[in-house]
Amino acid sequence: NQNQLTEIPVNYYENLLQLDLFLRKITSKEAGRKLEEAVKLILEARYIIFIGVGSSGALAEYGARYFTNIGLESYAISDPYQAVKGKGAPDVLSIVLSASGETDKIIERVVKLREEAPAKIISITNHPETTLSKLSNINLTYGFQTEYSAYDPLENLTSQLPVIAFIEILAHQAMEKADKCN
């Protein structure tokens, strides 16, 4: 029968199994509380700055576009040397994306933001015990197995699907909560 779906073997792409586990984990009470805290910061912000470099920079662009499309004023910074509008303002939220949580230019940017004022920072990283996660008000983590390119061993190929999931979940929860308040 041509209409039957074929099942993809688990060993076809290991990250599919990891994604399934991640999606189950984010429905837990603990994850729910963290997401609620993040949504509260999002709704308190005058505007949101997504920050990332490399693949995380592309996802920062996606996050800013997605949030803007639901009515949350957002900008993306994928160049670590770009100036930040209203930096250090207490009503500006930075959502910082970094799979490793250790990218030098990202850490430098976050340290500067924290020195200038009580910056509010949500980070999305692959692991919870990173420099970036420790500098953040809230850290959302996905815990995938780190994967590097055989072509260029310095290139991180860890799946970024959870980052997209976090961005979309946060946006939708913020939109729903804002609608209830209005």
Could you describe each region identified by the protein language model?
Residues 34, 49, 181-182:
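Secondary-structure transition/capping residues
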Residues 1-34:
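HTH-adjacent hinge/linker in prokaryotic transcriptional regulators
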